[in-house]
From Swiss-Prot:
Membrane topology: Multi-pass membrane protein
Keywords linked to the UniProt accession: Ammonia transport, Cell membrane, Cytoplasmic vesicle, Glycoprotein, Membrane, Transmembrane, Transmembrane helix, Transport
Extracellular compartment residues: 32-62, 109-125, 172-179, 242-252, 305, 369-394
Ranges that cross the membrane: 11-31, 63-83, 88-108, 126-146, 151-171, 180-202, 221-241, 253-273, 284-304, 306-326, 348-368, 395-415
Compartments, as annotated in UniProt: Basolateral cell membrane; Cytoplasmic vesicle membrane
Protein name per the record: Ammonium transporter Rh type B-B
One Gene Ontology term from the biological process aspect of the record: ammonium transmembrane transport
Sugar-modified residues: N48
Length: 460
């Protein structure tokens, strides 16, 4: 049996059903189909503008939405299954966060970007943006994986999605920065938000659960499923909301080449940093993806294919170095217990991506972009800014993202420390049997091991 504090029989149904009821009410009051998904509105447009059904944005955006959706539910979910006793929770809590997050983010982002005549108008692009927002929360989830209850994760999602919407609106609409692939708004914000939450929730006696924090052979194979899905679909992630035509085409190409170069750099550095020249599966699962993060801001810009490769190579190197040397320092010196190493996959590569975006913006000229300047840098195109000013605003956007992450993560961390949310004890972390019915007698055996603080690897 589980302890009283971690028993979810009342807490989880209360929070899930109450928040779902509130969300339904808010959708009923505010959310409506946009003109491309509304029966009357779309057919009026067909009649008035000589359009055809093939012009509906659904047919342009849905393939990208499918890919992003797979990344959110399969890619992120399975990437976190490396923990040997936490596979159920990794996949299923990812599922829970995403299911609630996409609904709540539809409301929050709708108020900022799709609010007209007192209503939020949603379409295919709204769904993509909702998934993007959810992605930031899942990145934060990686930092606290195994150390939080499902109720804590729901509360974190509720607040973080709200802060994400405000942060994104300030960066894109007030600062006027470009960040189609989310190096700043998604990866940097999500990573440092999660790291600060983890710092506030620091566990003095986590050593009692360290024996379950590692992986086994089959759990690493499951995690590689997530890696491969993320790697294949990352070009869609970065290009999903860019302008049709050359912008989307260019973003896919830049991400494609950055990921490829990043993968080679990851394999090379992983072997180089091992005394016996062996590869570390943690590096391959994670650092090989950093190339997608590194071109999130600059992907739609004229980065050039070789520039994308340079970005990917740098990201792979930085990420591997982070896993090898920086993660232990964060734990021992700064008391930041980063379960998935999100600082190395999302945090540092996100900052790198923001810096690359600012540098590329600095060299934006009419000779390079021609008439395409209006799509990529509209404020430069209309004369509101120079390229140098746009570059400085790109740096400012990075500071805004970091500020929201640090302040928001601190506030949420202290909220989650309240004892009412069913958090596991230091000896119960990274264990499915605390919250799940585990098949056979394995669950009862593992609970006994946890309660007695024994090493499960020594059990018969």
């Amino acid at each position: 049996m589980t302890s009283y504090s971690t028993n979810m029989r009342i807490k989880l149904p209360l929070f899930c059903l109450l928040l779902q009821f509130i969300t339904i009410i808010l959708f009923a009051v505010f959310v409506r189909y946009d003109h491309e998904s509304d029966a009357r509105g779309w057919h009026e447009e067909l009649n008035n503008h000589s359009s055809s059904n093939a012009d509906n944005d659904f047919y342009y955006r849905y393939p990208s939405f499918q890919d992003v959706h797979v990344m959110i539910f399969i890619g992120f979910g399975f990437l976190m299954t490396f923990l040997k006793r936490y596979g159920f929770s990794s996949v299923a809590f990812n599922f829970l966060i995403a299911a609630f997050g996409l609904q709540w983010s539809t409301l929050i982002q709708g108020f900022f970007h799709g609010f007209h005549d007192g209503k939020i108008h949603v379409g295919i692009e709204s769904m993509i943006n909702a998934d993007f927002c959810t992605g930031a929360v899942l990145i934060s989830f990686g930092a606290v994986l195994g150390k939080t209850s499902p109720v804590q994760l729901i509360i974190m999602t509720l607040v973080e999605v709200t802060l994400f919407g405000i942060n994104e609106y300030i960066i894109l609409n007030i600062v006027g920065a470009k960040d189609a692939g989310g190096s700043m708004t998604i990866h940097t914000f999500g990573a440092y938000f999660g790291l600060i939450v983890s710092r506030v929730l620091y566990r003095e006696d986590l050593e009692k659960s360290r024996q379950r924090e590692g992986s086994v052979y089959h759990s690493d194979l499951f995690a590689m499923i997530g890696t491969i899905y993320l790697w294949m679909f990352w070009p869609s992630f970065n290009s999903a909301v860019t302008a049709h035509g050359d912008d989307q085409h260019r973003t896919v190409m830049n991400t494609y080449y950055s990921l490829a170069a990043c993968t080679l750099a990851t394999f090379g550095f992983s072997a180089l940093l091992n005394g016996e020249g062996k590869l570390d599966m943690v590096h391959i699962q994670n650092a090989a993806l950093a190339g997608g993060v590194a071109v999130g801001t600059s992907g739609e810009m004229m980065l050039t294919p070789f520039g994308a490769m340079i970005a990917g190579t740098l990201a792979g190197m930085i990420s591997v170095l982070g896993y090898k040397y920086l993660t232990p320092v964060l734990d021992s010196k700064l008391k930041i217990q980063d379960t998935c190493g999100v600082h190395n996959l999302h945090g540092m590569p996100g900052i790198l991506g923001a810096i690359i975006g600012a540098i590329v913006a600095l060299f934006a000229t009419a000779d390079i972009y021609g008439d395409g300047m209006g799509d990529v840098f509209p404020l430069i195109s209309d004369g509101s800014r120079t390229a140098k000013q746009q570059s400085l605003y790109q740096f400012l956007a990075l500071l805004v993202a970091l500020g929201f992450a640090i302040i928001g993560g601190t506030v949420v961390g202290f909220i989650l420390k309240l004892p009412i949310f069913g958090t596991p004890s230091d000896a119960e972390c990274f264990e499915d049997a605390i919250y799940w019915e585990v098949p056979g007698g394995e669950g009862h055996q593992q609970l006994t091991v946890v309660i007695n603080n024994e090493d499960p690897d020594t059990q018969a």
